[in-house]
Swiss-Prot record:
DNA-dependent RNA polymerase catalyzes the transcription of DNA into RNA using the four ribonucleoside triphosphates as substrates. The N-terminal domain is essential for RNAP assembly and basal transcription, whereas the C-terminal domain is involved in interaction with transcriptional regulators and with upstream promoter elements. Residues 263-340 are annotated as: Alpha C-terminal domain (alpha-CTD). It comes from Anthoceros angustus (Hornwort). SUPFAM superfamilies: C-terminal domain of RNA polymerase alpha subunit, Insert subdomain of RNA polymerase alpha subunit, RBP11-like subunits of RNA polymerase. Keywords: Chloroplast, DNA-directed RNA polymerase, Nucleotidyltransferase, Plastid, Transcription, Transferase. The keyword Nuclease does not apply. Belongs to the RNA polymerase alpha chain family. Residues 1-233 are annotated as: Alpha N-terminal domain (alpha-NTD). It is found in: Plastid, Chloroplast. GO terms for biological process: DNA-templated transcription. Its EC number is 2.7.7.6. This is DNA-directed RNA polymerase subunit alpha.
Amino acid sequence: MIQNEIPIPAEALQWKCIESKIDSERLHYGRFAISPLRPGQANTVGIAIRRALLGEIEGTCITYVKFEKVTHEYSTIMGIQESVHDILINLKEIVLKSNSYKTQEASISILGPKRVTAEDIVLPSSVEVIDATQHIATITKAVYFNIKLGIRKDRGYRIENPVKYEDGNFAVNAAFTPIRNANYSVHSFENEKEKQEILFIEVWTNGSLTPKEALREASQSLINLFIPLLHEKKERENRKLENKDEYNVLRSCFSLTNIGEVRKEISFKHIFIDQLELPARAYNGLKKVDVHTISDLLNYSQEDLMKIKNFGKKSIQQVVEALQKHFAIHLPKNKFSIND
C-alpha cells in the first residue's frame, strides 16, 4: 500500500508532499515522505527534523500589554466583560506574522459597545494578523478600550519576569513556535532484495507559515549546525598558512637563535587565558584590560599588572603561578628584567 502511494526512486533520495490541507486559518496540515533510506537512517533524520520543527522555527507573538489605570492582573475594567487576566490569555493566542526582529508596538483604541477582535489591532506595516476573527474582549458599554502591545519575533518559549513590568504593564509568556505539532513514522520495504526505509513526517502549523515552509526552515537550521564541521579542514589549512606567513615575517626580523621563541609567541596568540584556570577576580581583571590570550598577557610584567585597577598582589601571584604551572613561563617583575 505504501509503495503504491509513493513512487520509490531507484537511487535518488527524494522529498514528496503527499498530503496538504487547511483545516482553518490557524491550522494547516502537511504530510511528507522521504525515500529511499538505508535501515536506521529514517529514525536519525526523523528525530532531528521533529526537534528542529518544535524548537528552531521562528514565530511572532505579543510579549507585553499596557493597560490604562490597571493595577494587577485580576483587575476588572469598567464596561469590559472580561477580566485583565482573560484579556491577556486571549492576546497570547493571537497569531501574527512578521519579517522584523525588532520589538515593535501595536495598539487598540476603540469605542464600545463592541466585540473586539484581532482585526481591531493597529499594527506596524511589517506585522500582519493571520486570523482577524480571534476574540480579544467584549465592550458592553459606551466606553473606550485602550491598550498598547509589544510584539517580537523569536523562537521557543519565553517566560517573562513580572517584576520588570509595572504601572499597568503586563508580561505575556510567549510561545513563539508556529508549530502546533510534529510527528514522524518509519516504514520498511524491500527493493531489489535490499531493505530500505521511508520516513513520513506530519506537520501542523498555526497558519503563519505553511508546513512545507516549516519543514524547509527546520532542514536549513540543521544544515547550518553542520556547515562549520564541513569547513573545519579548510579553516585548519587556512590557519596553517596564516601561521606560516606570520612566522616568515617574524623570522626576517629575528636571528636564527630566536626562532624557537618566535614559534612559541605565534602559538600563544591562539591560546586563551581560560587555560590558566585563574580565579574569577584575576580572570575578570585581565579581561577588563583586553588581555584575552597568553600572548596578550606576556606583554605585561608583574609591575605592569600592579597598575591594573583592583588587581592586587594575590592576583598577580596567581597569574605568575598559573603561567609557570601550565606553560613553564616565568613572568618578569618588570620589562627590563630577564631572569629575575
